[in-house]
Structure formats: structure tokens, C-alpha cells
Amino acid sequence: MLRFDYLLITALAISTVSVVMAQVPPEKQFRVLNEPGYAPYITEYDASYRFLNSPNQNFFTIPFQLMFYNTTPSAYVLALRVGTRRDMSFTRWIWDANRNNPVGDNSTLSFGRNGNLVLAELNGQVKWQTNTANKGVTGFQILPNGNMVLHDKHGKFVWQSFDHPTDTLLVGQSLKVNGVNKLVSRTSDMNGSDGPYSMVLDNKGLTMYVNKTGTPLVYGGWTDHDFRGTVTFAVTREFDNLTEPSAYELLLEPAPQPATNPGNNRRLLQVRPIGSGGGTLNLNKINYNGTISYLRLGSDGSLKAFSYFPAATYLEWEETFAFFSNYFVRQCGLPTFCGDYGYCDRGMCVGCPTPKGLLAWSDKCAPPKTTQFCSGGKGKAVNYYKIVGVEHFTGPYVNDGQGPTSVNDCKAKCDRDCKCLGYFYKEKDKKCLLAPLLGTLIKDANTSSVAYIKY
């Protein structure tokens, strides 16, 4: 027994030492300086960018490249870009390392003997790292699919960018319930920090949320689809026979288990069914090899896919899927389609609701500021104006609200809630929906669907 314990302890010690001793060889180590100077070609967000240069490391695997970029002065993000400099349509940023914690001029990206990839300021303050020190990392690589990896001596990934998505999924990249389970939008093109829109995978489905008021509101997604814990963005040939011409399909694939019928009983804003039975959702079909594609949650809350056709002489990028479109879910269902506020019908912003009625819409149309009208339980009157035949963007995903209840009770709830900008009432079903955010109001042919907006 003592001999067995001794052998076990010895084996564990040898294993531990072997991991600690597995180090990055000198010829694969690097330290890159974020030096002043900019590259000349156009890129997404109208960003300025800088190349990374090291005699020990290539940061470019066509068409993906690791670079620094900035949209505001002295605030740089380490990011992966897709596209080549000859592209007439601009190259795209598909992964950010430190978008919530940018660095300044002369910051450094270092990959030392211990295998930790570290982004630090000139004074040594660490702004981002992979936390892979002494975990057996022996090399750095950017793969042809856009996955940036740190691997051990056997080629096994110790860390990979595919496990840390920001607002974008590349082909083969996943969201996982037991891992990073969401995409988060940028705040704007100029501000790359986390924005108000997210797409979250849980055991109920893949759901899109907007949170501008402290209350997450559902506005899209596949809320009743069982992805079995994992959803992967994929592009596959329509036909398996490689000798025959084939279209390519953009898919959202669940974990590879026996398929179940996802059901679909509340898709009130949907123009056509999205996806098919069997668990896999078919987003679109394209007539070329779309292996280089990505799915992006935009700063405006949109969900779009873009595909890259490198054989084209210009305009290599094409929008190949849009969740809010004439073909899928109505454009009016996007909360920001009419900006901060507006009345939408058939993909057009046709009016600006006011207490005096519908006025001509412009990008200056804004909801009323109502906090001063909140009664707060003190009996102060709250005024509303009425809009007939309209629904809220979140209505289809919350079964039009709570009920049955009376319109007076619905009003009383909104009166008492300072965050409530208005309420939507379904007269036929006696359903009540309180709205802390208005955004785009959607025309409803059913005149029993009525909105009451505070002013």
C-alpha cells in the first residue's frame, strides 16, 4: 500500500513538473509595442489602426489579422480584423480583446516564457490577459477560421478567442449555457464598450434583449427553441457531393443530440417561419462558398450576417441575413428602427406620435420626458394621450402582457411607476403591458390594441 501511494505521488509530481516546465521557446516569444503611426486603408467604424510587427511571430493568417485600432484618441483595442487591404468594401472587426478597457500609445502586447498573453500600459498596468501563465502553453497561432489560440506542445488549445465572443460569431463559433452564453453589442460605432443590446442563450432559447432603463426587455430571437445548451453559427454545403455545384446554407445549429420539435406559437411579428424542424435553424442560402461569414449583433440592436467572397474584384462583403427584414421578422419590430421614437408601418416610419396626434416623422422625434408627472403615490395627476391600433415591440414575446385586467387597473399601475412611459392595452383579451421604453411603435390592424403614452 505504501509503495502504491509512493508511486502515485511520484507520478503526480512528475505530471505537475512537466506542465510547469512546458514553456514557450525563445523563438516564439514576442513583445510588440503599440507605436504611433497609422495604416492608410479604410476599415469598419472609420477606425484608425496599427499593424503588429515581430520577428518571432506572424499576426496575419489570410484573411484574418491581429491589430490595434481606435475610434477615439488614445484609446486602443486589440482586435482581429477580417479582409485584405485591397478590399474596396471595408475590412471588418470581428473580435475585441479589451473593448471595455482600452490602452494608450506605447502600450505592449507580450507573450513570454510562461505562456501568458498580456496587454499592458507603458507603466506596466495590465489591461487584459489570457490568464494562461504556467499552464503548459508553448505557442500562439491565428487559425484560418479566425480563431486565435494558445496551444500546448501537443497542439491542444489552452485558450482560444472562440471561447470569448463579443458582439460577433464566426463560422464554427458557439454560445454555451455552461460558458460564455451571450453576445453584447457595442454602444455605438465610435464607442466600442458594452452597449444596451444582448443576445442570450439559456435553456429556454436564444433571446435578444434591450436594457436602457435597468429592465431587460425581450425584442427578438428564438425564444421557444431548444438548442440543448449550445448554439453554433455554421455554414454548410447544401449538397454533400463535392463534385457538384452547390449553394451554401447559413445555419444556427444546436448541440448534436436527437432533434426535437421546437414549437412556434407566438411569432406575431414574423413574416415567414425562421428555420425548420429538427433543431437546426436555416437563416439563408447563398450561391457561393460563404465559409468566411459572421453573425453580428449591431449597436442598433439589429442581428445580421455578412459573408465574404474573396473572388470578387470589389464589394467582397455582402449582407446575407437580417433578422429584422421584409423576409424574416418585420423591420418595424426593431426597437430603434424609427430612432428613439416613431410610428412604423410596413417598414416605414410614418409618424411621430404626440398629444396632438401623429406628426411627420423625423430623427428628432422623441418620447416625452415623464418623470415629473409620476404621482409617486401622492395623488398627483398623470396625463396620457391615446394611440389606436398599435403594439409594443416586446408584446409578441410576453404574450401581450399580463391579464386579464381592466384598463383602469392597467393605468393605475403605470401611474404609480415612474419608469413607465406608457401602457399598451389589448381590449379584446384585457391584457396590460407597461412600457419603460417606447422606441418604435408598430402599427396593428387590430384597433382593439391601444397605447396610452404619458406626457
UniProtKB/Swiss-Prot annotation:
* Stretches assigned to the PAN domain: 374-455
- Please name every pair of cysteines joined by a disulfide bond in this record: 410-432, 414-420
Pfam families associated with the record: B_lectin (PF01453)
Record's signal peptide: 1-22
Which keywords, in A-to-Z order, does the entry hold?
Answer: Cell wall, Disulfide bond, Glycoprotein, Lectin, S-nitrosylation, Secreted, Signal
Induction notes from the record: Up-regulated by continuous red light.
Is-annotated flag, keyword Disulfide bond?
yes
Q: Where does it live in the cell?
A: Secreted, Cell wall
Q: Where's the Bulb-type lectin domain? A: 43-163
S-nitrosocysteine carried by residues? 374
Phenotype upon loss of function: Defect in both hypocotyl and cotyledon photoresponsiveness during deetiolation.
Q: Which residues are glycosylated?
A: 106, 191, 211, 241, 289, 446
Where does this protein chiefly localize?
secreted
Gene Ontology, cellular component aspect: apoplast
Give GO terms: molecular function aspect only.
carbohydrate binding
Alphabetical list of PANTHER family matching this protein: BULB-TYPE LECTIN DOMAIN-CONTAINING PROTEIN (PTHR32444), CURCULIN-LIKE (MANNOSE-BINDING) LECTIN FAMILY PROTEIN-RELATED (PTHR32444:SF10)
Name of the protein in question = EP1-like glycoprotein 1
Which organism does this record belong to? Answer: Arabidopsis thaliana
